[in-house]
Amino acid sequence: MAGIWRLSNHWFVTRLNIIYGASMKYVCKKSSFKYGDCIIEIPNGSLGWCRDIMFSALNQIEALLSVTSRVFIIRFDSHVSGYSQDNAQISVFRRRLIKSLRRRYPDLLFGYIWVREQEKAKQQHYHFAFIVDAERVPSASVVLDAAIKTWERLTDIHPHVPKHPYYIVKRGDEQSFIEAAERISYLAKSRGKGYRPEQTKDYGASRFKMKAANDSRF
């Protein structure tokens, strides 16, 4: 059993736990992999990436594409004011954001994946990819604007929006799927993962299921 040590008033699991912990036991170092008929390139893949995180994201894209013809992928990053041992703030943020959007778009299908990371800073930060039914919102910016406002109200911190935060993936369009997958792969990088209490998750994802009658596999 790996031990733990105290550093800057926070508890961190040792590297042994990071490598073999529940969310880090499928670390790959391949620069690409096959998903259905698609070859997905992983930028800096040789540095390590988490297979379960990557496949959770791709599975959610596919699941939504089995019930709608196209989805927006929207990237969003956020910091918190101080370290916390759990991800409770993310749960509150997610609930409030979805509630806010569904007031205007009641039937909106809203998928997501988020990851928790911590490197040299004293507190963790988060990366998000929202996977949203593009048939039921007028634009991706509507979702991003709502996310920014929700996060600011919750934390009083302005989030970071990466360059080119929007992607659109169309059912049956292999190239759009590959491009979005390669962008989302940033969330799956192993660096920064694992620095958290054992019971706390490194990532979370929505749980949409594939509609069997309309399999979207490319």
Segments and roles (model prediction):
Residues 18-68, 134-218:
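Catalytic "initiation/cleavage/transfer" segments centered on a nucleophilic residue
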Residues 59-119:
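Signature for HUH/AEP ssDNA processing cores
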Residues 72, 124, 183:
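Residues that flank catalytic or metal-binding motifs in active/ligand-binding sites
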Residues 112-135:
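Histidine-centered divalent-metal-coordination microenvironment in nucleic-acid enzymes
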